Swiss-Prot record:
GO cellular component labels: plasma membrane-derived thylakoid membrane; proton-transporting ATP synthase complex
HAMAP family membership: ATP_synth_b_bprime (MF_01398)
Protein name: ATP synthase subunit b
Assembly notes: F-type ATPases have 2 components, F(1) - the catalytic core - and F(0) - the membrane proton channel. F(1) has five subunits: alpha(3), beta(3), gamma(1), delta(1), epsilon(1). F(0) has four main subunits: a(1), b(1), b'(1) and c(10-14). The alpha and beta chains form an alternating ring which encloses part of the gamma chain. F(1) is attached to F(0) by a central stalk formed by the gamma and epsilon chains, while a peripheral stalk is formed by the delta, b and b' chains.
Gene behind the chain: atpF
Record CDD domains: ATP-synt_Fo_b (cd06503)
């Protein structure tokens, strides 16, 4: 066999190549080729499944994005409607407050007018009462004065004449 190796090596046939770089390169090409040949189906299937999973996830994400966009637009519409309703309520509240304020002012003016009328009525009544009291006092004073002077001025003839005239006045009535 020793004779065979030198002959084959000298003839360019099979032999042992001791050049480390050439042999590693050849071995590496052989290993990569074998791995490619055997793992092509396994890695290809795994990568295909991964690609399908990623595509499915992307489609799901797009669906969720569309759904979220639709829900966002609905929420924005509802927010806009709620803001409009809140503005309407605020304006109604302001109008109601203004109406209440105006009504309060009107009632205050009416109450003040009523107080003024009551004060004038009280003043008029008090004036009438005082006038009546002064008349009574004047009449009583005049009667007292007349009664005080009457006995001195009336004698029995004048007294009889006064009584007769008073009786005749009463009969006419």
């Amino acid at each position: 066999m020793t004779l065979l190796f030198p002959l084959i090596a000298s003839e360019g046939g099979f032999g042992i190549n001791l050049n480390l770089f050439e042999t590693n390169l050849i071995n590496l090409v052989i290993v990569i080729g074998v791995l490619y040949w055997f793992l092509k189906g396994f890695l290809g299937g795994m990568l295909e499944r991964r690609r399908e999973t990623i595509l499915k996830d992307l489609q799901d994400a797009e669906k969720r994005l569309k759904t979220a966009t639709i829900e966002l637009s609905k929420a924005q519409e509802e927010l806009s409607a709620a803001q409009q309703k809140a503005e309407k309520i605020r304006l109604d509240g302001q109008a109601r407050a203004e109406a209440i304020r105006a009504d309060g002012e009107k009632r205050t003016i009416q109450a003040m007018a009523a107080l003024k009328q009551d004060a004038l009525a009280d003043l008029t009544a008090e004036g009438a009462r005082l006038t009546e009291q002064l008349r009574r006092e004047a009449a009583l004073s005049a009667i007292d004065k007349a009664l005080a002077e009457l006995p001195n001025r009336l004698d029995s003839k004048a007294q009889a004449k006064l009584i007769d005239s008073s009786i005749s006045n009463l009969e006419d009535v």
